[in-house]
Curated annotation (Swiss-Prot):
This is Drosocin antimicrobial peptides. Changing A64V: In strain: 2CPA51. Proteolytically cleaved at a pair of basic residues corresponding to the RXK/RR optimal cleavage site for furin proteases to produce two distinct antibacterial peptides. Changing P35M: Significantly enhanced translation inhibition efficiency. GO terms for cellular component: extracellular region. Induction: By bacterial infection and LPS. In 3rd instar larvae and both male and female adults expression is detectable between 1 and 16 hours after immune challenge, peaking at 6 hours. It comes from Drosophila melanogaster (Fruit fly). Changing T52A: In strain: 2CPA1, 2CPA12, 2CPA51, 2CPA105, 2CPA118, 2CPA122, 8B, 8D, 8E, 8F, 8G, 9A, 9B, 9C, 9D, 9E, 9F, 9G, 9H, 10B, 10F, 10G, 10H and Oregon-R; required for antibacterial activity against Providencia burhodogranariea. One of its GO terms (biological process) is response to bacterium. Residues 20-21 form a propeptide. Residues 32-40 are annotated as: Critical for inhibition of translation, possibly due to its role in mediating interactions with bacterial 23S rRNA and peptide chain release factors. The record marks R30 as: Critical for inhibition of translation, possibly due to its role in mediating the interaction with bacterial 23S rRNA and rplV/50S ribosomal protein L22. Changing P24K: No significant impact on translation inhibition efficiency.
Amino acid sequence: MKFTIVFLLLACVFAMGVATPGKPRPYSPRPTSHPRPIRVRREALAIEDHLTQAAIRPPPILPA
């Protein structure tokens, strides 16, 4: 008798688990793959600007 009740409870739990649709994945407002490339690109542009400014500026003339 106990085995039958336990088996029926397990069958009900399994049936409910199969019948419910899968939960949607939790929505993350900031996906992990998005902010990093923009930051890296921005840093690369800033470094490039700094290098071009350094290349345009003539080197200082040091006294011999």
